């Protein structure tokens, strides 16, 4: 099923999905590897299917196969299509760079590329601030965390991380303020 143009996808207040892990599939430690194998086979039949490509990347990520996930996310981003999914693929590829321990310049550039594509999303800025904090680059972390904290909650439909738009951005900003000597602002932010 495809909807062209995509959306709108209104939120329905009061409804949620209750996820449990009681079934046989949920207990299978190789479930995401099996999903990836099925999706790879499907992509052999339909190589241009962006949905298959996206879920292949998600499956590799959830299986802990970060290098394969990164390659699949990059491929999905290159396919174009739904802007939010392309952006999310680019953002996840940046996360995979970080998890794989790639050089700092590559990780930073990947997060900035994700930010440049959808500057209304706080997630890449918060992830970048957290990464820089881990490198003890407090002043740089402060710049990105402060900007993330100023962004309103994104109105996108795909995987909006409300915590990144809220407390996580403020927490990263406060930590960076503390370590750059602005303890008064850090205290107010916390």
Walk through the language-model features, giving the residues of each.
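Short coil turns that delineate tetratricopeptide repeat
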Residues: 47, 81-84, 119, 153
